[in-house]
Amino acid sequence: MHSDPQSVDLVRREVIETAETLVVKVGTNVLSRDDATLDVDRIAGLVEAVSRVRATGRRVVVVSSGAVGAGIDVLDLGGRPEDLPHLQAAAAAGQARLIHHYDECLGQHGSHAAQLLLTADDFTER
């Protein structure tokens, strides 16, 4: 289709600039410091950028990783766990902290964060 990288970038930019709704997936690496803990300043920067886009009348949905990094801070683990039980504990403890930071930053722009809770029917009924 478009084999030229510049052409692909132009198409991507046009799609982003004309879309009514943008879905932004934020990976753990974007939100993590070198020590694997949560970088709250990155959340603030992301929220600032999202707010600027929303001010143009477009909808923005943020899908975020980062709960494990937030949980490392909460549980004072000193680094990313390797085993599944500790990863699960970090994610569980960190999810509330992550949502709190998003909500705090979004509140400064008149918005709120919410966690979408899915059921099995959400996958079978659509």
Give residue ranges: language-model regions.
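Nucleotide/pyrophosphate-binding catalytic subdomain
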Residues: M1-R126
